[in-house]
Amino acid sequence: MSFRSSPQGKPHPMTDYQSIRPSEVEQLFEKKFHYQKPKGNKSWQLPPPDQALFSEFYQFEALQGLREQLNAVKSKLNDYGVQEWSAHTNRRDPSGEVSWRLKNDTKAEFVTVAWCKLFECLHRYPLVTKPAVNSMHLCEAPGAFIASLNHYLHSKYEKDEIKWRWRSTTLNPYYEGNAINQMISDDRFIVHTLDNWFFHKDLTGNLLDVANIDHLVERCEVEFQGQVDLVTADGSIDCAAQPDCQEEIVVRLFFAEVLSALRILSSGGNFLVKMFTLFEACSVSLLYTLNCIFEEVHIFKPATSKRGNSEVYVICLNYNKDHPDLPRLLEEIKSKLAQPNDTLVMPLFAKFQIPHDFLMQHEIACRMYMKLQTDAIEGSIYAYESNDRHYLRHLHHLRSLVANTYYSLYKVKPLEDSLCIVDKEATSKALGFQVPVYGGSYTERESLKHGDLLKQIYCLRREFNQLEKCLNNRTPYSYVKNRTAPLNLHISRGAPVQSLQSSMFASEPILILRLRILDTFELDPVWQSAPKCQLESKTLCYLPPTEDEAFHTAQQRFFIDLLEEVKKLKPDSIVFHKFLFLTHYAASLLLFLIESVYQDCCFNSNQAQTLTLSKLKDTANSALEQVLELLKDEQAGAIHSLLDIKELQKNQFSKALIQHNNSIVMTCFRSMLGEESFPMPVAPTSNSDVGSIQESAAVF
């Protein structure tokens, strides 16, 4: 039996489940749209200088009608559990076998769904037309576009022909001020290619800051001598909390990506940017802009893009950088982006400035992609509710056909290991543990958000219990000193971390639960352990920042005090009690103390949760003086780390530190979420009059 789509998008059985019409596979690979530009005097033009930009707010009624239709279908998913629904759509994804085969049969480098999608785009459009190419990749983490482009180049050209230089930027996973739920923290590719990544002067990697766009332009001028042939932009923002407002939420990011690309791309260059629904007038004006300054603009939804989501790739070919009206346009966009509170939902152009024939074509494109998405959602609902075994058999056959078509159409072949950018073993290591937490449906999450505190605590406890099952806290951990060369300082500076939002020195599920507890109780679990450092006769308490202080200020103050006391008292040992080293600043100072100041270190994973450094070195004083001088002078920018990132990541030291931090944070969770506990703020204590203080008992 085969299937055909009903008007509602539900598959109806026909006569033979095993027969699949060629059009069913073809439809997956042909979700394309090409804007047809008029020629001559009727060609689409940017508004002249005497016409204002961002001058009025309006919407297009027909497009808003399409938006309402799409949201009506998407709202049918409100009562499905997010994990359960995601697992269901993954099983139903007809392209699901493609990435599996690329990983396991072809053994391609760093395969993700993004890898598969870019590989399609490169084969379907002339984004790269010669073996000598300079490419810039925006919002690129974890790096799959780069690995995919490398595979494409080596599949199409001989090794000796290829002259490829690439650089990339993304939200910096090593900068603790970047929110963990707004960035990709997978650094398996990044850590081995750090010299190719721009995180800008503030180290955030945040393209929404126009100063970082300026820095990006400067760096590209130096690195590529102004010749950038290809720019890709794969950014997005999590819109799970407001699924009906995705387009408005991401519009600032789109403008930042487009502004960056148009400033760094060379004349004749190509641009690929991921977008979502295109119903809003601000998106219409952005697409019209791209059509005015590129020879060709296409919209493409790859076969490996999940059918039920809104993502599409806008592909722009042959950039006209010398367009006379372009500089004013870029300056206006930059000015708008420089205002953090400006949502940029105001359309770039007035309504009369957008030609009717462009709007007609744009509406056709929007209708097509909206219909594809609603059909996919309706089909998924039907499959979920019916549990039709014959349909599942049909789907299994379809997945195999789609994978075969992908391999045949794009001439997929394996590459020699020597042609990979990073050693495959390094990028194939597991990211960590996954926690099977029930996320609930959208309706349940909304109800919980506005529900009573006890329900929220119950959900947090349930998540904590799942975390405890996944973590093995009884495994001992240690750091064995085996360094043959001295530890070299390598100072990195950037914007001070205002609040601790992420860390590479604790497991991601733990950090996410910490943020949820913080949202619920408005108390930060990381301070609930009352961290302190014992220097034989003296104790230093690590105090949280005051209301008006940055997190960086608090950590800077503590570590300067600590190093001053070690220098003055020369204690033969120091003991950190329930002390979290979650930032590169703290971790680099710890490694400095271990390697340059003390001879021995011992992680104690029992209930005390201590870290002891002992046997003060004879050369400690000079090392301490050098580092103290650096810590006190931040005129050139706040210190992010004293050591090279590679000294602190993906090694025995980082593994021990992650286990140490995980153990302490879990203890804090246990105290805050226990049956008899209710969180209470820690009373601040001054270090000035502390000689020796007792363990704080009831801080919860």
Curated annotation (Swiss-Prot):
Its EC number is 2.1.1.296. Disulfide bonds: none annotated. Residues 109-321 form the Adrift-type SAM-dependent 2'-O-MTase domain. PROSITE patterns: SAM_MT_ADRIFT. Keywords: Methyltransferase, mRNA capping, mRNA processing, Nucleus, S-adenosyl-L-methionine, Transferase. SUPFAM superfamilies: S-adenosyl-L-methionine-dependent methyltransferases. It is an enzyme of class 2 (transferase). GO terms for molecular function: mRNA (nucleoside-2'-O-)-methyltransferase activity. Induction: Induced by the branchless FGF pathway in migrating tracheal cells, resulting of the switch from the intersegmental to the segmental nerve. Residues 1-21 are annotated as: Disordered. S-adenosyl-L-methionine binds at G143, W164, D234. Its main location: nucleus. InterPro entries: Adrift-typ_MeTrfase (IPR025807), mRNA_Cap_2O-Ribose_MeTrfase (IPR050851), RNA_MeTrfase_FtsJ_dom (IPR002877), SAM-dependent_MTases_sf (IPR029063). Probable S-adenosyl-L-methionine-dependent methyltransferase that mediates mRNA cap2 2'-O-ribose methylation to the 5'-cap structure of mRNAs. May methylate the ribose of the second nucleotide of a m(7)GpppG-capped mRNA (cap0) to produce m(7)GpppRmpNm (cap2). Regulates expression of tracheal genes required for pathfinding on the segmental nerve. This is Cap-specific mRNA (nucleoside-2'-O-)-methyltransferase 2. It comes from Drosophila melanogaster (Fruit fly).
